[in-house]
Amino acid sequence: MDNELLLLSSNDIPFLEAQVNIHQPTLSEISLIGEESFFSGCQFLNFSKSILNLEDKTDLEDRSDFEIFMSIMCSSEKLDYKNNAMMVLTLLFPTSQIKFMPNELVLMNKNGLSRINSANFDAFKDIIVSMFELNDLDTGGGYNPADSRAAKIAEKLKKAKNRKAQDSPHKVAILSRYVSILAVGEQKDINDFMHYTVFQLKDEFKRYQMKQSFDMYVQAKMAGAKDLDEVDNWMDDIHP
């Protein structure tokens, strides 16, 4: 989505295609489910066949991303992944009851019913990708769909996840690390960051990194250093 000011405002995001607002959870709210569960759930909600190789795409060419997603969510073999996605959905729609139907996800609240289905699933993913900047994220993931064809894809993704886990066995601690760095670097109360959204935190962290690099570059130039690589102006746009 192309509305940086709305994302920075921490206001709810209108999901017009489903006639419902998507809540931007704060770090304090996310902490209730933990970063690992949060990012695992986000990856499920952002499922796309585009991550698959040509052979796998061909095998599932008659299935939409939403259909594969629903087969994953309806699987009872790996409840942890389904639960992670459900917890994220609860953060996104805190005033709604969430129910999975055969061909749609139904949100029930005081304003009536809203539906996420094959017609608006891409729009939904576009919003959460922007909210959480998921294109910058690589924490591994797992899929275990009920459908036999999708299950083949799940096995390959599971193997890829296991390889990543062996290369980087540490637990996911992206947001907490950002908070810790900014609290020290900017000399702020660490509790202040708990009211930030993910987009606000990442925006400030990127800007802080750019300013640190820019200030070091200027200081080095003033001290007479030569042959330095140019750095971006810290006030440049950071959201492509």
Predicted regions located by residue number:
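Long amphipathic alpha-helical segments with strong coiled-coil/leucine-zipper propensity
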Residues: 78-157
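Long, intrinsically disordered, low-complexity Ser/Thr/Pro-rich regulatory/activation regions
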Residues: 221-240
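An amphipathic, hydrophobic-aromatic interaction surface with interspersed Lys/Arg
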Residues: 1-67, 126-217
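Extended, charge-biased low-complexity segments
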Residues: 62-85
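Short coil/turn linker and secondary-structure boundary residues
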Residues: 25, 79, 116-119, 173, ...
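Aromatic-enriched hydrophobic runs in primary sequence
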Residues: 70, 76, 214, 218-221
